[in-house]
Amino acid sequence: MQIQTIRQYLPHRYPFLLVDRVTEVTDNSIVGYKNVSINEEFLQGHFPEYPIMPGVLIVEALAQVSGVLGFIMNNETPKPGSLFLFAGAERVRFKKQVVAGDQLVLKSELVMQKRGIYKYNCTASVDGIVAATAEIMISHQKTEQA
């Protein structure tokens, strides 16, 4: 799935769209990636002499790829008034720094679904080495545009 299609699933735009491509989708899992460039705005201040991707943005990238999966799993096309929103994160662990030039591989697998809340086991890795893990929860919400 290329960026044009990802933009149909996610409301995020520059500089906050953190999924560049989706490479694999199954009934309950998704794999995508974020190419981390030295030109990222967040790297200008985190940290100027040693730029690393903030951990919270790694978690956000995992939530975004999980949101894409939420639409796909429900066989739903995104439309105004319907979003999968980041509802929470548990058991977040950061294991490796992510730096400019890295390709951050984002994996998300559904582990629970109940009343519009979805829980995913997520892993972010670089070159096959785990950079972060988290349990991500998203919620299917109707917005005021509905």
From Swiss-Prot:
Keywords: Cytoplasm, Lipid A biosynthesis, Lipid biosynthesis, Lipid metabolism, Lyase. It catalyses: a (3R)-hydroxyacyl-[ACP] = a (2E)-enoyl-[ACP] + H2O. Its EC number is 4.2.1.59. InterPro entries: FabA_FabZ, FabZ, HotDog_dom_sf. The active site is at H46. Gene3D superfamilies: Hotdog Thioesterase (3.10.129.10). GO terms for biological process: fatty acid biosynthetic process; lipid A biosynthetic process. It is found in: Cytoplasm. Transmembrane segments: none annotated. The keyword Lipid biosynthesis applies. One of its GO terms (cellular component) is cytoplasm. One of its GO terms (molecular function) is (3R)-hydroxyacyl-[acyl-carrier-protein] dehydratase activity. It is an enzyme of class 4 (lyase). Belongs to the thioester dehydratase family. FabZ subfamily. PANTHER family: 3-HYDROXYACYL-[ACYL-CARRIER-PROTEIN] DEHYDRATASE. HAMAP family: FabZ. Involved in unsaturated fatty acids biosynthesis. Catalyzes the dehydration of short chain beta-hydroxyacyl-ACPs and long chain saturated and unsaturated beta-hydroxyacyl-ACPs. This is 3-hydroxyacyl-[acyl-carrier-protein] dehydratase FabZ.
